[in-house]
Swiss-Prot record:
The gene is pufL. The reaction center is a membrane-bound complex that mediates the initial photochemical event in the electron transfer process of photosynthesis. It is a multi-pass membrane protein. This is Reaction center protein L chain. GO terms for molecular function: bacteriochlorophyll binding; electron transporter, transferring electrons within the cyclic electron transport pathway of photosynthesis activity; metal ion binding. It is found in: Cell membrane. The keyword Iron applies. The keyword Transport applies. The chain crosses the membrane at residues 68-90, 123-151, 156-178, 211-238, 262-287. GO terms for cellular component: photosystem II; plasma membrane; plasma membrane light-harvesting complex.
Amino acid sequence: MSRAKAKDPRFPDFSFTVVEGARATRVPGGRTIEEIEPEYKIKGRTTFSAIFRYDPFDFWVGPFYVGFWGFVSVIGIIFGSYFYINETILKGPYSIPQNFFAGRIDPPPPELGLGFAAPGEPGFAWQMTVLFATIAFFGWMMRQVDISMKLDMGYHVPIAFGVAFSAWLVLQVIRPIALGMWHEGFVLGIMPHLDWVSNFGYRYNNFFYNPFHAIGITGLFASTWLLACHGSLILSAAQYRGPEGGDIENVFFRDVQYYSVGESGVHRLGYIFAIGGILSADLCILLSGWPVQDWVSFWNFWNNLPFWSGV
């Protein structure tokens, strides 16, 4: 006679009733998102209101917070998209009926230096697109700061976004200024910018000799690996519904490698590796063509160190 398999006492009956309705809670007796959100839609506590004592943009559109910086970001998105779409899709040889993925917006010619192109001149559309994209990125970062202030959170999210934003600034603003010409900015366009990235490495002999390139790639790959390990562990342990779930996750990594960095630690470590990788990539780009013209010759100092004498 067949018998039903006995339940493991560590795995309680975790069946639950799903509350009907969009975005509803799955926890019995819990509150829906719609019930919770109003408590956190707090007026004030923004950078704009802290300076001017009033923020006319301190409101929400549905679940989305607007704020002054959200408004600034939307303005940047609208005008930046206009210049980009107009130049790469609506005009030029790569219009809609053709391969607009190959459309490009070239930076100003070298002879313009750090000047500003007049409307209709080469480089004008590039400068306008870069200007409004920079405004949009900065506004989005500051909007994240405002939301963090409202919720009394740390500033880890806007800092991480700001580090990604720094890569754009280095490529399109800081490095061109350091080299004295906007022409050193990268070409805008889906396929052309990939060609620019490929050619950039060859300009300085062998980019694999660039130590900051290696450190940046290591940081990005390591953060991906760390958070993939963390995500797979959480999914595996999610099958266990007991109160000791966190302990089980720590025990797993102690069994695997004798040490567990902990739930908070793995997020912190992935965060540090990710932003560290981008900051290293910033140096990788900034130093190329400015103080360093050839990354292979850059390593000549190693052979001239005094402790190699006589070797």
